[in-house]
Amino acid sequence: MSERCGRGSVRRRSVLGVSLCALLAGCGSGRTSGEEVVSGECVPASEAMSSPSVSPSRKSDGSTVDIVYFPEDYIAAEGLAVSPDGALVAANQLRARFVLGLDSTFGTVIWDASTGKVVRRLDNRRDGVLAWHPGGEWLAVGDAFNAAIQVTDREGNLLWELRGHERIDELGSPIADLAFSKDGELLASASRDGTVRLWGMRKDQCRPVRVLTISEPRRLSFSPDSDRLAVAAEDGCSIWNVHSGEREKLLHEVPHPVTGVAYGPDGVLVAITSDPGASYLIRGEQVEAGPEPPTSSPSRVAVSKDGRIAISASSDPQVMLWDPATQVSSLAPEPPETVGRMEWSPDGQNLYAASQKHGVLCWLADGLRRFDLP
């Protein structure tokens, strides 16, 4: 991996004892066909709502929600994205330190990938999932308490607010994952409301395209040709045709719960499961065993430009790297805690990960480095 990088972190807990980790598992399917979107809209910036509430205190039924914030929480576990040219890394700073009066803002922060220094704060008060458009100019941003998705330019200027997913009362982001197609024409959003929505994204146009009904979708990955979407959900792993909305496959050979999916550049789909802890390689109609994860609870997977696979766990800080050319696996230098979302740099040289307490982490040829905290 290349030679330079930088440092950051966050976590939220509930006095009600709700586990966020329990909300982030799965890979699956529901119906055998999609439905044309009859609701949902791309609202232009001039009509969009103001910033989401900083710390909502009531559910829709009027009951109260108590949230405990911790000053050592910095980065959203799923809020990480690398720019298509590899020059920048974005992550979402959690609201914890803002609520506690320790920071003046929270939301999307952008770092220089080579130095690990903060170059921009979007001050958008969003701390959920994050995706970077392959054209490099747009970011799609979720929020911990808001079901609407914001699409902004890289300076933080709001372009559209995507509405259609339902609000979820329980703690944990209602938007579980966001992914742009490789050609940049679609944005997929997975929600805990039991749907995956597809949004058309072309130049200066945004429109709702389709909604797929899927039981508890958690992870998304587009195929290299942008024609298919793999969905990790509570009851299994499925592959959907994005043009017809038809479910093409429900992978019965992959036991559920499936906790992660990622397409490689050659079209091979990698799926990981937590019970038992295993990985699978899906090549067309063939499903074969993949590299053995480092622990029994693999939770995230990322595939590089040259097909190398990184797998992390929810219960152990180890990150395993597997090279398909040599069929050899190794452990990356151990991070200080378990990591969230992982992404490779476009050239496949660096691996980035979100750490709630320690910020953005970067594995390079000479070891593990931390970006500056936001």
Regions found by a protein language model. Name each.
Residues M1-R7:
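N-terminal secretory signal peptides that target proteins for export/translocation
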Residues E3, G17, C21-P374:
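WD40-repeat beta-propeller superdomains and closely related acidic/aromatic-rich repeat-like regions
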Residues V10-L16:
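N-terminal export leaders
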